[in-house]
Amino acid sequence: QIGAHLGKNPVTVSDRTDRGQATLATGFPSRFPISDAKAVSSFAEILTSFGKVRMIGSACASLALVATGSADVYAEHNIMFWDIAAGLAIVNGAGGTFELEGVNLPEGIHSEPCTVVASNNKFDVSVTMFDKMRGLA
């Protein structure tokens, strides 16, 4: 059966629409410019725009939280595609969506880190949420 399942039971993304009640799953970006006050402030701004934040240390497990409705959004900057590929397929199978920036599929999957946002498709979130942190806004 096509879709995302936990055992024999289908899973679906949450239907939450209130960002203040939503859970963001994320990770601390590798190569983060910790001494850059603007980047730190921008990252904190992203985190505090959600009701809850979860950092569990595994991109794929974080994406599984989105797929099962335990989290509403997963966002991370500077992550390698192989760390998220399987999780993105699970989110997609559970009815969620995702956006990638910085990876040219399929030939670019082994080269540069990318930025990803996956969600239940109920929030206005995109990879541009990291623009201020990256000094692009």
Question: Where in the sequence are the language-model features?
Answer:
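An extended, acidic
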Residues: 12-137
